[in-house]
Amino acid sequence: DRLGKKLLITGKGRCNVTNDCSAQEILQNIPRNGRFLYSTMNAFPPEKIKEFFGENGCALKTERGNRVFPVSDRSQSVLEALQKAMRRHHVDVVTARVKGIVTDNGVVSGVRTEKDTYTCKWVRYI
């Protein structure tokens, strides 16, 4: 499969990156149990998301309803920014269908795909 396949079709091909409001406002507007997003939204609030994409070559704009899109109106710009950041951080990308999660003493230690099994020393939960 292709990297970013689902991302490229979001927002009618434009990709709504975030909302131009506080993390608190976003959490308050999640219809059911937004608590599971609390730590993620505080680690990556909209300001940091906008900064990240700007630093990676994807200028953003705010439209009605505080929705934030790439200035290009193309989700491809969002994917290219993510790929640029991955290259800079030497991230290896594997695209394969996941068959299962590998655990060691109840701790996630990898993922099993149709191609291979990939292990890790740890998984960081934010």
Question: Where would I find each of the regions flagged by the language model?
Answer:
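Aromatic-residue hotspot detector
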Residues: 27, 53, 69, 100, ...
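Predominantly flavin-linked oxidoreductase catalytic cores and closely associated redox partners
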Residues: 2, 9, 76-126
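Short active-site-adjacent helix-start/loop capping segments
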Residues: 16-18, 26, 61, 69-72, ...
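Short beta-strand to alpha-helix junction loop
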Residues: 37-47, 64-84
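Short gly/pro/ser/thr-enriched loop/turn and capping motifs at secondary-structure boundaries
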Residues: 2-5, 15-16
